[in-house]
A protein has these predicted regions:
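N-terminal glycine/serine-rich phosphate-binding loop of ATP-dependent small-molecule kinases
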Residues: 2-87, 112, 139
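Gly/Ser/Thr-rich active-site cleft segment
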Residues: 2-4, 110-178
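Short, compositionally biased low-complexity segments
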Residues: 24, 101-103, 154, 158-159
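Short, charged, surface-exposed secondary-structure boundary motifs
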Residues: 31-36, 98-102, 171-173
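Conserved donor sugar-nucleotide recognition element shared by glycan-biosynthetic enzymes
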Residues: 45, 49, 96, 123
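Short beta-strand-loop/turn "lid" adjacent to the catalytic site in phosphate-handling enzymes
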Residues: 54, 58-90, 116-121, 151-174
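Carbohydrate-associated surface elements
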Residues: 93
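Acceptor-binding helix/loop patch of EC 2.4 sugar-transfer enzymes
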Residues: 102-110
Length: 178
């Protein structure tokens, strides 16, 4: 589980029904002069995830699968090689609450133009703010959640695949148009 303050891994052994867990501090926070801005270093997070995976691989040789959970509203931008080209903008990021047009904040403005619920901290509200303010990295090719980024890195791929449940958590999602 890739949480905002900690990252943990769990091994479940079905024959003995035993559970072993490892928890590590998520020390990836990036300081900012703006108190509304909440970012983390995506590569530090991935290094912690890899540390946990390696620890389990050393202790347990017959791991049959890996499941990933974590912060579901935040986004990280990736380039065509699948490398992070931005920090992880976490679910706590408040840029969507900043004033925009017609005395509305970014989240409300996006909700009004799309017709979909939108809240500050949701990935597509963050992305909307970043677009409007020229903050999307020039080499950004995709965006994804930190879980999708972790799965991409663990599997050796260079394009994130977003599960519909994660896509829905970013906001502005219509399950009927899947």
């Amino acid at each position: 589980d890739i949480g905002t303050s900690s990252i943990c891994g769990v091994v479940y052994h079905p024959s003995t029904q035993s559970v072993i867990s490892v928890t590590k501090e998520n020390c990836a926070n990036i300081s900012s002069p703006d108190n509304w801005e909440k970012k983390q270093d995506a590569d530090i997070i991935i290094n912690i995830v890899w540390d946990i995976v390696r620890e389990f691989q050393t202790r347990y040789k017959d791991i049959g699968g890996i499941g990933i959970t974590g912060q579901m509203h935040g986004i990280v931008y990736t380039d065509v090689q699948g490398n992070a080209v931005s920090p992880l903008y976490t679910w706590q990021d408040g840029r969507g609450n900043l004033r925009y047009k017609d005395n509305l904040n970014y989240a409300t403005h996006l909700k009004n133009i799309t017709g979909y619920p939108a809240a500050s901290g949701y990935g597509l509200v963050t992305h909307y703010y970043n677009i409007q303010n020229g903050l999307v990295p020039a080499d950004a090719f995709k965006l994804c959640t930190i879980m999708d980024y972790a799965v991409m890195k663990l599997s050796g791929n260079n394009t994130p695949l977003i599960d519909p449940s994660n896509a829905a958590s970013l906001g502005i999602f219509d399950k009927e148009k899947l």
